[in-house]
Amino acid sequence: MADEMSEPRRVGFVGAGRMAEAIAQGLIRAGKVEAKQVLASAPTDKNLCHFRALGCQTTHSNHEVLQNCPLVIFATKPQVLPAVLAEVAPVVTTEHIIVSVAAGISLSSMEELLPPKTRVLRVSPNLPCVVQEGAMVMTRGHHAGNEDAKLLQNLLEACGQCIEVPESYVDIHTGLSGSGVAFVCTFSEALAEGAIKMGMPSDLAHRIAAQTLLGTAKMLQQEGKHPAQLRTDVLTPAGTTIHGLHALEQGGFRAAAMSAVEAATCRAKELSKK
């Protein structure tokens, strides 16, 4: 099965929302799988139309997806995933690789709902997967092997960065990167509004703020510098940047950002226990 799965002929999606569409789009654009070899299911046509627009096959039957695809990504809402797994369990075999992108549902919970020795993996994505710049982590269950993990990682790198981690890191990733998208957007908005206050037109301010975040992120990735080092590179004695940083420190910016990640992580852990 390992040779067959090295390049899966068919990839299935149970659930066809925005994240499922983003992952499918990334796989197709990167040439990881042909559009006609993607099969997605959902209860209604509301989201399936987006998959059809990509050239994918669609169905209202979850069983049909499992019966036709060796690798199936479950992208349902977390509250319905247990019921969906219980529904498809009769058609799941040890030949399947089952992947969940639903938040708050542990590997052990999924394994309990599926047949013995089912190969299960869990992925925590974030919204930039929509533009193939996601920051994802993945973790595997008891019966998923190295080849399964490598296969999934290779596929998902079409949607951004995908790193294998212990499951205990998944909730932290939710606080850092899943919720972090909103934190970064809030910072970008605040930067732009500062410029607007000083007289810059709104559209221009927001464009420049977004590009500043993008350029800074690329420098951090490509140069491999610690953020503190890059920040220091911008500083000049008695210059504009140190005055601005002083204002951020007076406002408790650093502590607020740390507390935001902590609060979001704690909430993710609470939801995982329910």
Swiss-Prot record:
Q: Say which family it is in.
A: Belongs to the pyrroline-5-carboxylate reductase family.
Name this protein carries in UniProt: Pyrroline-5-carboxylate reductase 3
Organism classification: Eukaryota, Metazoa, Chordata, Craniata, Vertebrata
A molecular-function term among this protein's GO annotations? pyrroline-5-carboxylate reductase activity
What are the GO cellular component annotations? cytosol
Q: What does this protein do?
A: Oxidoreductase that catalyzes the last step in proline biosynthesis, which corresponds to the reduction of pyrroline-5-carboxylate (P5C) to L-proline using NAD(P)H. Proline is synthesized from either glutamate or ornithine; both are converted to P5C, and then to proline via pyrroline-5-carboxylate reductases (PYCRs). PYCR3 is exclusively linked to the biosynthesis of proline from ornithine.
The reaction(s) catalysed by this protein are: L-proline + NADP(+) = (S)-1-pyrroline-5-carboxylate + NADPH + 2 H(+); L-proline + NAD(+) = (S)-1-pyrroline-5-carboxylate + NADH + 2 H(+)
Q: What EC number(s) has UniProt assigned to this enzyme?
A: 1.5.1.2
